[in-house]
Swiss-Prot record:
Monomer. Belongs to the peptidase M20 family. This is IAA-amino acid hydrolase ILR1-like 2. It comes from Arabidopsis thaliana (Mouse-ear cress). Its EC number is 3.5.1.-.
Amino acid sequence: MALNKLLSLTFQLLLFLLSVSSESPWIAEDTSQIQTKLLEFAKSPEVFDWMVKIRRKIHENPELGYEELETSKLIRSELELIGIKYRYPVAITGVIGYIGTGEPPFVALRADMDALPIQEGVEWEHKSKIAGKMHACGHDGHVTMLLGAAKILHEHRHHLQGTVVLIFQPAEEGLSGAKKMREEGALKNVEAIFGIHLSARIPFGKAASRAGSFLAGAGVFEAVITGKGGHAAIPQHTIDPVVAASSIVLSLQQLVSRETDPLDSKVVTVSKVNGGNAFNVIPDSITIGGTLRAFTGFTQLQQRVKEVITKQAAVHRCNASVNLTPNGREPMPPTVNNKDLYKQFKKVVRDLLGQEAFVEAAPVMGSEDFSYFAETIPGHFSLLGMQDETNGYASSHSPLYRINEDVLPYGAAIHASMAVQYLKEKASKGSVSGFHEEL
């Protein structure tokens, strides 16, 4: 009797092991072998040519924040052709795709879709067809890499130990599209999120990141300094807002040089000054505006900017009104990378591209609204290099900006590898059972 019971238990155990082996071969397979397969798939001529075609189509038809209707339509069309379910609309033009079991764990990959109000200065076959609009920050490449990852992951969907959520986000450039997507449930059930940004300052085939604070928090300000205009030859009969504005610009610089710990990076930049239209007339008012960047003490820095502007204006007998959210542009928190996800990213990059491919990044004073995702759940943001020795690449937000299309398979493979590795590690530790999300 005992022998029969033992044989029955042994048989059940063998059936379970065979089930795990047949359904989840990646659990036992070497990580580097898995990632090599993903990269090889991404670099295959068929997939690479497909990605280049998509990227160029998006580049030719740039759309600003919350206007990405055609970009979103293209994304949905490609997801349908691949066979991926999606949710639309999210945050007006956003799209969220789902690959895998529909059950936990859920891990997200994110790409931004919007272009910039810049006239493209690069003359080539696929130059922007829309006057005054251009993909000058690589978002066309970001969308393409995430679609590439979608194709890779769908090809291997039966091996996924959970669900990959594909977030195609609108309005990264100053309009906080990530925050709106978050408010509309983009992170529902998601346990971790990854994002990649192309960089012309990092060598091709390398990727950079750091644990903890990576990108600064950011905000903008606009102030109107009002005095009393008049003839420039008789300034004693005026209250000159130009002199007041000049004093304000200089005084704002002291917030960093004299009020900030030298070991704590902050930036206050006045980047626009408008006022007056004649050589011999002192204007009634001057408008100034700029940006603030900080990793810590951001609210205090905002308050000091407001105080300096209003009180320096008063010294010069002027009035000043300060707007810290002009055109609805809300401050963004700093982007802070989760330490465990950073370690995972570092390992994935080295396994995928070689030991020398990972670059330890310094903190960057640039900002990203990916931070809204990363302050809600564990997140990791990274930079993927596209610089090479033969071609110079302009920095982002330049009319001469262009991307190295050879980097597209690398970004797609890193995206896919991060998702696979995250789900694999969660599966090895055990995950929630008895849950099913209707996609």
